[in-house]
């Protein structure tokens, strides 16, 4: 009987210890101190690049994070001329098609190429590498160009 009581005390102690971890310890490494809603608000109100970067990292935890980032990437690109955001627009627009680019429509393909080229012009390294290695230019068959990128 004493063994059962001692065993029960040990189990209860272990359960109590496991429940007392702080939120910080159990949060993912890419979890910022602000909520996603707060980050989105800062992007909308001030174009805060730190908030944008934090939001893009936070959304990595979500299945459709690329698609959720798209409107904020467009805001940061179009209103605040942020190079990373131009690349993120390109990436978010093409992400649903990354396994098979053929179903993409020509307008979406043209927009994606346009944002990729602007990101490259603004000095975004990854965009420049893609543009140079695949000879991407504006006013060409955008679907064909995306096919060469994703092959």
Predicted regions and their residues:
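Short coil/turn linking the two alpha-helices of tandem helical-hairpin repeats
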Residues: 56-65, 90-102, 132-135, 139-142
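Structural signature of tandem alpha-helical TPR/SEL1-like repeats
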Residues: 29-37, 63-71, 105-111, 142-144
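Bacterial Sec signal peptide processing site at the extreme N-terminus
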Residues: 20-32
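C-terminal motif of bacterial Sec signal peptides marking the signal peptidase cleavage site
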Residues: 15-18
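Short helix-capping/linker turns of helical repeat alpha-solenoids
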Residues: 42-55, 79-84, 89, 96, ...
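Short coil/linker segments at helix-helix boundaries
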Residues: 67-68, 92-119, 149-150
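Bacterial N-terminal signal peptides that target proteins for export
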Residues: 1-8
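Terminal, low-structured helical/coil segments at or just beyond the last alpha-helical repeat
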Residues: 30, 112, 118-151
């Amino acid at each position: 009987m004493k063994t059962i009581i001692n065993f029960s005390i040990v189990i209860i102690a272990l359960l109590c210890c496991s429940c007392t971890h702080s939120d910080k310890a159990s949060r993912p490494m890419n979890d910022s101190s602000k909520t996603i809603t707060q980050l989105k608000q800062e992007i909308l109100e001030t174009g805060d690049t730190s908030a944008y970067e934090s939001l893009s990292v936070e959304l990595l935890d979500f299945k459709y994070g690329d698609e959720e980032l798209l409107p904020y990437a467009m805001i940061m690109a179009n209103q605040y001329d942020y190079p990373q955001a131009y690349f993120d627009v390109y990436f978010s627009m093409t992400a649903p098609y990354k396994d098979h680019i053929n179903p993409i429509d020509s307008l979406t393909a043209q927009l994606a190429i346009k944002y990729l080229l602007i990101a490259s012009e603004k000095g975004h390294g990854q965009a420049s590498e893609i543009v140079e290695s695949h000879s991407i230019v504006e006013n060409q068959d955008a679907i064909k160009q995306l096919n060469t990128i994703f092959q």
